A protein has these predicted regions:
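Secretory targeting and sorting signals
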Residues: 1-29
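Beta-strand-centric surfaces of beta-sandwich/beta-rich domains
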Residues: 33-231, 236-318
């Protein structure tokens, strides 16, 4: 069954836009020494900030299915800095003592999305979902990090306000209290860093991100008419179980591949364990008016009506 959250989310975001935010999400300091390294030399030279959003107590599973916190919206949540560039995002789900919350312990990070309230979203700015602001980072249970090439970063300004959408599941019969943890590598705003604009590509664009697939191999498309021309430097993808890969191609250049993000699945194929990422300076140069096509490819033994096909790209505007 498709998730119906558009109306409450739209009402909440409209309210936030009118009153300029709401109460911040609770964020606690991480345990001593809890700082995840990144693979980028640029990120290594930056300072590290860890923010934990929560706590979230997920109800226990019942005979009807897993316990769930379903698309909980929080307004004006904590940022890692007031005036900086973010060089990398590393997501996780943890318990209060800092240990990882995983499927093995019953907890699942179905997804979370961060949005910057007063910035225009590149692909849904004219839609009701644009009230959420610019979607600039997200993760599913695969917990893919976004690390930018040296000299690039996502700008944070003192007047920005962030929103957070969280969806969590609990497969165990007992409640689980968890935190969404994000490790940020940051640089000061006065440093020489080239700014990035996030672009959200989605098969079910500007809706709930879910769509249906048949049994067997399927390749579902969504086309973006480029309105953020420039250098694409980083891309990452998100799929559900039985997902094979998600790819962005430039159809105006004969289908040239920009990024092919490949899924690594669990042994039963039901769970995505990781997604490959693409990074380059640049991966590609895109021009205004070109057509970038999103391909979401599944190989499922049965039909499904709740899969996703998403890529998040970061562009240095021309």
């Amino acid at each position: 069954m498709r998730k119906v959250w558009a109306l409450p989310l739209g009402v909440a975001l409209l309210t936030s836009a009118l009153v300029a935010g709401g109460p911040p999400a609770e964020a606690s300091a991480p345990p001593a020494g809890e700082e995840a390294p990144t693979s980028s030399a640029e990120a290594a030279a930056a300072s590290t900030r860890v923010v934990r959003y929560g706590p979230y107590t997920i109800p226990g599973a019942t005979s009807n299915g897993p316990g769930r916190i379903h698309n909980k919206l929080q307004l004006a949540v904590q940022r890692p800095c007031l005036d900086c560039y973010i060089m990398s995002f590393t997501p996780d789900l943890v318990y209060g003592d800092g240990t990882r919350a995983t499927m093995a312990t019953g907890a699942m990070l179905h997804h979370f999305v961060l949005g910057s309230q007063f910035r225009r979203d590149a692909t849904c700015g004219n839609d009701w979902l644009g009230l959420f602001g610019e979607r600039f980072f997200a993760s599913g249970d695969e917990r893919t990090a976004a690390t930018f090439p040296s000299g690039y970063g996502y700008r944070v300004r003192w007047y920005d306000s962030w929103n957070l959408l969280v969806d969590l599941m609990n497969m165990s019969p007992s409640p689980r209290t968890v935190y969404v943890k994000v490790t940020f590598a940051v640089r000061s705003s006065w440093e020489s860093v080239r700014p990035l604009k996030p672009v959200w590509l989605d098969v079910d664009q500007c809706r709930d991100s879910e769509y249906s697939i048949p049994a067997g191999v399927s390749d579902t498309h969504w086309d973006w008419t480029v309105n953020v021309p420039g250098k694409v430097v980083t891309m990452l993808g998100h799929l559900h179980g039985h997902g094979v890969r998600v790819e962005a191609t430039n159809e105006s250049l004969g289908g040239a591949s920009i990024c092919n993000s490949v899924a690594t699945l669990s042994s039963d194929q039901h769970h995505v364990e990781s997604m490959s990422t693409c990074r380059g300076d640049p991966l590609a140069v895109i021009q205004a008016g070109q057509t970038v096509r999103l391909h979401s490819i599944y190989n499922s033994p049965h039909p499904a009506d709740d899969v996703m096909g998403i890529m998040l790209g970061y562009v240095h505007p021309a």
